[in-house]
């Protein structure tokens, strides 16, 4: 019987948990194996574009997400050298899309909301402190061995989904796939900072354009907590980052008002994609399959679209007898959209924000960005890009 199907998901981040919820709500038995002891609370992705919201609504989690985060319609480009603010507004999509908003919600909060909803389902189990250390794949089954707090425990199932991030065990050790691409040379520092950007007229998301003080500034919650991400030389010592944050903020913030750095996390940015997202009973999604720099919020959005598309087709394979060939179509479309759409756009976003030198090229870009803000048809077209990332099968 189909109810006996068990899907093993390796990785308990938002992409893995969304996949579990979509499968379990359709009656598929699921187990999620997460190596860490709890959801990470380090500064990570927090913006979810408007095409994601109807999926969260369908899964029954949107109301909780909105209550824990905030919804916004506009965002701004700020030219650091002149202090000019250029606003684009999602309200131009009203009547065209179901929910013309972006959701701001910390990735850790989203994970905890998803876990609470999963707890209410009898056919899903989430196991923390359960790293996978070995795996055997047969023609109709998979078998994984756990380490950590459950050494030697064996979990058997019919499908294995690798949602275990950029350093994916499933990609490296089970599928033995390459992860070709580039690593951007700069280091980026994400901070959670308490400061009142609202009173300075910043958008809830503000992209500050400058080749030295370029930054992404996003409101995290209603308590004046904001994410501020900036770039620095990777040759600088890691141990001096906290002091350098204060130095950068002296130039980055247009005021001497006090601020509080609550948390910070340095990281490198990448553009990489696996050779294959599927081989037989093993499927990769999210950062396990492809990683992009997060400028513009396309990384987690792309991973969520992986999850939504996969749950749709895998539930059909398990419950409706649809041919497994549809999973190859899923793989081809998700890789193509990352390679042809997501990675190029995210790379353009990063270069425009952090690397434009003063001069004619930057002036042309600013003039074009400003002209879009005054032309509702062009702004509508520009804002609908995230829709192109989705897969319908």
Swiss-Prot record:
Cofactor mode of binding and number, as noted: Binds 1 FAD per subunit.
UniProt-recorded Gene Ontology molecular function terms: FAD binding; monooxygenase activity
Matching InterPro entries: FAD-bd, FAD/NAD-bd_sf, PheA/TfdB_FAD_monoxygenase
Phenotype of the disrupted gene, per the record: Cells lacking this gene are not able to grow in nicotine medium.
Catalysed reactions listed for this entry: 4-(6-hydroxypyridin-3-yl)-4-oxobutanoate + 2 NADH + O2 + 2 H(+) = 2,5-dihydroxypyridine + succinate semialdehyde + 2 NAD(+) + H2O
Record-listed FAD binding positions: 6-35, 277-287
Biological pathway: Alkaloid degradation; nicotine degradation
Source organism superkingdom: Bacteria
Record-stated family: Belongs to the PheA/TfdB FAD monooxygenase family.
Function according to Swiss-Prot or TrEMBL: Involved in the nicotine degradation. Catalyzes the cleavage of 6-hydroxy-3-succinoylpyridine (HSP) by incorporation of oxygen at the 3-position to produce to 2,5-dihydroxypyridine (DHP) and succinic semialdehyde.
Other remarks on this protein: The catalytic efficiency of HspB is higher than that of HspA.
Protein known as: 6-hydroxy-3-succinoylpyridine 3-monooxygenase HspB
């Amino acid at each position: 019987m189909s109810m006996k199907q068990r899907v093993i998901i390796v990785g308990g981040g938002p992409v893995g948990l969304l996949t579990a919820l979509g499968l379990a709500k359709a009656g598929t038995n699921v187990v999620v194996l997460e190596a860490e002891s709890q959801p990470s609370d380090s500064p990570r992705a927090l913006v979810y574009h408007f095409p994601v919201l109807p999926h969260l609504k369908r899964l029954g989690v949107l109301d909780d997400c909105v209550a824990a985060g905030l919804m916004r319609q506009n965002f701004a480009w700020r030219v650091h050298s002149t202090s000019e603010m250029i606003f684009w507004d999602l309200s131009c999509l009203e009547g065209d899309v179901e929910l013309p908003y972006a959701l701001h919600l910390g990735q850790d909060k989203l994970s905890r909301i998803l876990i609470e909803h999963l707890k209410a389902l009898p056919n899903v189990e989430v196991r923390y402190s359960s790293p996978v250390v070995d795996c055997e794949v047969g023609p109709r089954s998979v078998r994984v061995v756990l380490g950590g707090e459950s050494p030697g425990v064996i979990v058997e199932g019919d499908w294995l989904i690798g949602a275990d991030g950029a350093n994916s065990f499933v990609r490296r050790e089970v599928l033995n796939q390459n992860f070709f691409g580039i690593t951007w040379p700069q280091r980026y520092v994400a901070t959670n900072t308490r400061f009142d950007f609202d009173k300075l007229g910043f958008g809830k998301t503000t992209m500050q354009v400058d080749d030295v003080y370029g930054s992404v500034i996003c409101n995290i919650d209603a308590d004046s907590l904001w994410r501020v991400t900036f770039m620095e030389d990777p040759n600088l010592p890691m141990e001096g980052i906290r002091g350098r944050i204060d130095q950068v903020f002296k130039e980055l913030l247009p005021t001497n008002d006090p601020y509080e750095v609550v948390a910070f996390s340095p990281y490198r940015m990448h553009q990489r994609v696996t050779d294959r997202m599927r081989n037989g009973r093993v499927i990769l999604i999210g950062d396990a399959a492809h990683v992009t720099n997060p400028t513009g919020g396309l990384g987690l959005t792309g991973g969520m679209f992986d999850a939504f598309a996969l749950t749709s087709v895998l539930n059909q394979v398990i419950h409706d007898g649809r041919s497994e060939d549809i999973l190859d179509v899923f793989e081809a479309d998700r890789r193509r959209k990352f390679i042809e759409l997501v990675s190029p756009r995210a790379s353009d976003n990063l270069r425009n924000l952090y690397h434009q030198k003063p001069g004619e090229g930057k002036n042309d870009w600013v003039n074009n960005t400003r002209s879009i803000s005054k032309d509702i048809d062009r702004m509508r077209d520009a804002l609908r890009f995230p829709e192109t990332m989705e897969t319908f099968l």
